[in-house]
Amino acid sequence: MNQSQTWSNGTFSSPDGNIGDTNDNPKVFDANLSNFTGCDSAAILRYEPPSSFTVSSKLEILGRETLDGTLASNRSQTFRIFTTSSSVAAYTVTNSQGEDFDAAPSNWSNGAITAMEIEGNTLNTTLVGFRVDGELLTDPGTLDTTAKDIDSLIDTPTNYTADSGNNGGNYCTLNPLESALTGINDGNLNSGSSGSAGWKICTSTMAVSSGKYYWEGFTDTTASPSQGWQWGFCNVTPSSLTNPYGTGKWSYQHNVVYSQSSSGSNVSVTAGANDLLAYALDMDAGTCKLYVNNSLVHTFTGISGTVTPFVGSYNSPTVTVNFGQRPFAYTPPTGHVSLCTQNLANPTIANGSTAFDIKTYTGNGSSYGNSQTISGLSFNPDFLWIKCRSNSSDHHLADTVNGINKNLESNSTIGNQTNNNNGYISATTSDGFTVVYGGLDGLQTNDNSKTYVAWAWDAGASTASNTDGSITTNVRASQTNGFSIATYTGNGSANQTLGHGLGASPSFVLIKDRSSSQNWAVLHTSAGTLGTLDGGTNYKLLELNANAAARDASYNTIWHPTNTTVKIGEGASSAHWTNKSGDNYVMYAWTPVEGYSAFGSYEGDNSTDGPFVYTGFRPRWVLIKNIDSSSQEWVILDAERNTFNVTGKVLYANTAGAEADLGAINDRHIDILSNGFKVNRGDPLNQSATHVFACFASHPFKTARAR
């Protein structure tokens, strides 16, 4: 009801002759009475809903008398209720010693209500409101006292669709974890000021790549050009939190719009203090409409990627945002919905454990052949990565295409090992795998009383030959899960291609020579580009088994990922990492799946309060590497070994070391959140450098719940 009813501009008078001043122009009914002003003396405010309505149980009258902002006593207010039977019921309510009004008349005439009037009987300001069957009547169309002041908000971890149009779920808010503004308040819906003569911005907790969304914002009483504010949206990882302009940012200030540039364009409408701004974003069309006080001002075009709302302040102005948790002031354009988890697109993978899962277990082997079956996975695993937590031991990587009883080690250059003397995997099951004590010991997989973690991926149901590239590959791929395993034999030639079967360009690729001792070649598309090579983008090379920084153009080993292939095999000795003639190789390739996997980068700041990294889901497994340093490890963290924050129990992919708890060492850790992760202090996670990451979800943000 409260989103569709509006006030009329009908009967309104005031004995002081200043019709429309602050005291004479109350246009909101609200329960938070301390925020509102009302009628002076005989001023009358009339409310007419778009259509008549009936009251099934109770009509409540709310009010408060004030005098210059302080409570007055023994003041009265007259309320009139008009019905379809043409009858009028009038009620006069008097408070006592400045108390709030709270009356529930039950003797109005039969018939549906067509109008309500409020008349002030004293020369004192009155704060007033009606509540019908427990629902507050609100004027969503006025700006001086508006929905921004409503403190009863719709926000719940339970997603549901409501007949009223105000769906249930977690609503977007400003994100204090990705903000240069330090005074965010009002439930993270008010930006707070920058506190200095310089731009500072704050992003939001939700980002979208598809769909149609609407949100509003109110400028404050000091929102002037010299005391600046910014209102806009930007790419999910903004280049700067102290600059509201530039690539990947679209915004509005005063009477200028900015589209990915610091040079703006003037528009016909000037927004100042106490104005209502709104955006109607259509990611499917790549457009966004900007409204000021419900008038269309500008349409942004050419929007792509994943974007999130942001606000900015230069010195003192603030903006109060409303993503739908409060009633909107205006009706959103057709098809546009609030930024609420219920309204987000349904994820391809609703539960991350159906594509990636983690098991921890304790070994039980003490002699050769002792085995145990680990169960409880949500699928039959195709790729298993096992590490002993309690002791120093090599990593154990095995897959069903290479052969599950054969393994590689992420921390070494060694090739295939069959039935490893330090333990191996003998088989997989519909929900797990069997680990065996080896000829020497079981330290890699099943040594008595040792603790282990196993990370498991699902690569689909079948393996087939793939001839998309110049070298034939044997591929097992799940396009739904964005993961494939491929084996091939090198031919020693330059500029070769490998089919990966993903149907989308991979962002993260591991290649290892199975026949001889060679480094692990790693392609990560956020590690930095080196121009073009043989018609494709060349990326810096990384090594999984080493703590080296990213390699330069002399290591042209793996590059140019496309929807069907990647290129390999050009360069000096590094060519042997991916294409030595006659050697057998395995390739693991991932492409991002929205709500399930993410591969990106962040810039560390070497502070105790590091960057927030948006993933669009609650991470379950995170791999991080500082690519600028030659002495920083590949860090693995997960939510199975760390069941609550802080998340600081680490294993290093490039070393054999036992698990270490960095959370207990100078507070070096991350916090796992419902929409990403927050990096904290120091090395190896937050140096002043570029860090790349690979991340897999427990649940997408739509269902991850606020944490």
Where would I find each of the regions flagged by the language model?
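Generic beta-strand hydrophobic packing signal
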Residues: 10, 15, 57-62, 116, ...
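Extracellular low-complexity Ser/Thr/Asn/Gly-rich intrinsically disordered segments
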Residues: 1-2, 6, 11-13, 55, ...
